[in-house]
């Protein structure tokens, strides 16, 4: 097709990678022009490649913001201007510390005014004698918030859940995470064990001693989904412990036998770790959550206060950090319900294709941006390594949806 190179948005994750990619495209175009000097279209691409959008997420968001700061919602009566400055890491840390110091002073004033949640949080962390743990937790939670497309909305949702704890642990985020990890691990090891049992058919001696135990544990692991439907305590009743493996003398392939033993040991260790989670019953976990609830709510309120104060101070100084640029981009590209704005549709119209490298390293914030500026993800092409995630990580299924008719490339 007679495409122009600047009809594409190409996202990489370092400036060096962006420069390298631009250089490779320019070199390839030069080589083709040398072979086809009469091709005017190719010659035009040599000029266009230097204005093509080949950049990092930060650079893309920064350019978008400088063109559209007028669309940002004011913060305490102020807004960023197009000449806003991006804070470097050290500046950001210094400014965060100053703002947090003021916010913590207000927190102690709340305690003096009789705020019981604030007092419980302070007592739990030993605050007053040493504020370091309190400030560390606020900054840790703040940093985690930045991985969400709508941080304060997400925090408000968590606060509502802590204010009204469900009757069952499976209905809490904490319980769901534990159970989902177990289900993911069980599915992973069940597949591994069944596959290994199939391989054993080539080695009758190993098969006779090992296949039965492997299949027995695989079958036990398959019981986890049904147990999860019954609740948290039912998960603890599943017992996928390995029976003792039989002895194998003069195995057909000693290396294969040792590989099977090593697989068994890894599986047994992983299963044991999961079973330990359920050694404490559901009611004990729920009681802990009820006791921690007021302190957790106070921590969330303190973090929300810090987030707002820090944002106000940055806007007052007409500056932003890297995560701000991404969140501001979401603000002007999506409505509160996540629908693309007019600006998003306008940006989407610029590009035939949006290509994202190292997609496994994207977070929900960046994924939201890519989704907003694509045509319902039909022109979004992503390349990433599906195997970069641990089996125990939370599911990231949105990374593995197929866009258009492409399969995912391999890194």
PLM-predicted stretches and their roles:
Residues 336-353, 373-376:
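Short basic/glycine-enriched coil/helix segment immediately N-terminal to the Walker B
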Residues 27, 31, 262-276, 282, ...:
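Conserved RecA-like helicase ATPase core segment
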Residues 46-53, 72-150, 258-267, 271-278, ...:
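ATP-hydrolysis module of ASCE/P-loop NTPase motor domains
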Residues 1-73, 313, 317-323, 328-331, ...:
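P-loop NTPase Walker
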Residues 52-63, 122-147, 299-305, 320-333:
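Core structural elements
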Residues 9, 51, 352-353, 379-380:
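The start of beta-strands in P-loop NTPase/AAA+ ATPase cores
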Residues 7, 132-320:
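Conserved ATP-driven helicase/translocase motor core recognized via long
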